Regions:
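Cleavable N-terminal export/targeting peptides
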Residues: 1-36
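Transmembrane beta-barrel domains of Gram-negative outer membranes and organellar outer membranes
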Residues: 27-189, 199-309
Length: 309
């Protein structure tokens, strides 16, 4: 099973290649059509423009060999895998509805904790362009997500009463460059069960060709207010879980900052094929800049397909 998961980026790429063989490539005519979606922090880091698409994403994350707890450095190792299908529907260039988090999680540590799998919490919301200037290739958008606590507790979902996640995102194009960033908060409705966090993500990419975009991304999560959940992991962990998991840690402020950097690319497989506008494949390799023991990530491989319509 682990081998199959590791091969998923190749499977997605092979599927894209098949679609590419039947694709029709024409010049993009819509404003901002040449810009790409970020790859990492898939739950909270979205593009600023309002566009319609289906997004299939797989994130395979190696867990640290040891994690920081009130009992000392506890062995963990193993991996976490998230597979999700996300969607956005744009009513116009100013407004869209978003299904941002709905997927399946495999949590398979080698030590201390049990292997488990289950459904992630569902998050949905909307996005509105506060400033929209195609001639300057500049957008500023506001987004509001609501997460519902219906997921599987076995994989650290379903705790609390959900949360609200407001954010502001900008996009700026310059020649062949794309710059993008977001700043937001995760505000739990039950402060005892989930931590409040502030996050920021940044993206820079360059159109090496009209189809190929090397990229760099940076993500930062900061615990603004720790929770007080009594579950075993939450009661001893000295950190929070990052973008996918909110542990509700009683000691999240001990190591409140979690920062990662990622390098990767997007490849535009086709443009304008029938009712579809374009299909993009993305891949990124991500590493923590903070101590890996103070989180749940030793490294992460993210691969996705984005089908615009």
């Amino acid at each position: 099973m682990k081998g199959t998961i590791r091969k998923l980026p190749l499977i997605l790429l092979a599927a894209g290649a098949v679609l590419f063989a039947a694709g029709i490539c024409v010049a993009a005519e819509e404003p901002f059509a040449r810009f790409i979606k970020p790859v990492t922090n898939p739950v909270y880091f979205d593009e600023a423009q309002n566009v319609s698409y289906v997004h299939v994403v797989n994130a395979y994350q190696d867990l640290p060999k040891r994690i920081s707890t009130k009992l000392g450095r506890v062995p963990l190792d193993g991996h976490l895998n998230l597979t999700a299908v996300r969607a956005t529907y744009a009513f116009n260039e100013k407004f869209s509805l978003i299904a941002a988090k709905d997927g399946y999680i495999d949590f398979k540590p080698e030590h201390t904790l049990e292997h488990d799998s289950g459904w992630g919490d569902i998050a949905a919301g909307f996005k509105y362009a506060l400033y929209y200037c195609p001639q300057d290739e500049f957008i500023v958008s506001g987004k509001l997500l609501f997460e519902f606590a219906q997921g599987s507790r076995e994989v650290f979902q379903g705790n609390g009463d959900g949360n609200a996640a407001p954010s502001v995102t900008f996009l700026k194009g310059y020649d062949k460059w794309q710059f993008m960033g977001t700043l937001g908060m995760i505000i739990p409705f039950n402060a005892k069960q989930e931590s409040m966090e502030i996050y920021q993500s940044y993206h820079v990419s360059y159109a090496l060709t009209p189809r190929f975009f090397p990229l760099l991304e940076l993500n930062h999560f900061c615990v603004a207010r720790q929770a007080d959940r009594e579950e075993l992991v939450a009661s001893i962990a000295e950190f929070e879980g990052g973008d996918v998991i909110n542990l509700g840690s009683q000691h999240g402020i001990d190591h409140r900052n979690f920062v990662t950097v990622a390098a990767g690319f997007r490849y535009r497989i086709f443009e304008k094929a029938g009712v579809f506008k374009n299909l993009d494949f993305g891949f990124a390799y991500e590493l923590p800049l903070t101590n890996p023991n103070d989180g749940l990530m030793d490294n992460r491989y993210t691969a996705d397909l984005v089908l615009h319509f």
